Amino acid sequence: MAGALRKTMIYLGLADGDEHYESEQSVATHHDEERPQAQEREERRAPAPVREVVREMPTVDAEEEYRAPVTPIKRAASSREDASGLRQITTVHPRSYNDAKVIGESFRDGIPVIMNVTDMGEADAKRLVDFSAGLVFGLHGSIERVTNKVFLLSPSYVEVIGDDKKASETQASFFNQS
């Protein structure tokens, strides 16, 4: 076992191979050749003088230094500029909760949606309003009640101006989630 470990150490360069061969030789032969081998080993083990190579780096003046050309960065159009191109509003009269897909896709595309739930039952209407509230929350929009069962879903860049805000807050009986 020690022989296998020793061979592995020699193979990996962790031990000298000469010592391994010495142990295999007989004692008599070892005494006769001890001095010449010891001198050879010391000669082999003596580190060779290392020449230092020093390269001088050329000095570069600041004026001669290469500079890449500067590329101006164009500013992206803000969402307020996109709002000036707003030309469309989607009006949806859902009959069931399955019509939520049309509402979600239109709003996701940045189109304001007017949702009229007067033709729906109360349970489905509440579900659709809850869906719409989550939709506008996730896409940073806003939802406003226009009448008792009509709602406006507007994207974040659309500003709705109206005088009836306080009047609509007093009529909050239908969708009060208490």
Swiss-Prot record:
It holds the Pfam family SepF. InterPro entries: Cell_div_SepF (IPR023052), Cell_div_SepF/SepF-rel (IPR007561), SepF-like_sf (IPR038594). Its main location: cytoplasm. It comes from the Bacteria. Keywords: Cell cycle, Cell division, Cytoplasm, Septation. Residues 21-65 are annotated as: Disordered. It is found in: Cytoplasm. One of its GO terms (biological process) is FtsZ-dependent cytokinesis. GO terms for cellular component: cytoplasm. Gene3D superfamilies: SepF-like protein (3.30.110.150). Residues 21-46 have a biased composition (Basic and acidic residues). Cell division protein that is part of the divisome complex and is recruited early to the Z-ring. Probably stimulates Z-ring formation, perhaps through the cross-linking of FtsZ protofilaments. Its function overlaps with FtsA. Homodimer. Interacts with FtsZ. HAMAP family: SepF. Belongs to the SepF family. This is Cell division protein SepF. The lineage of its organism: Bacteria, Bacillati, Actinomycetota, Actinomycetes, Micrococcales.
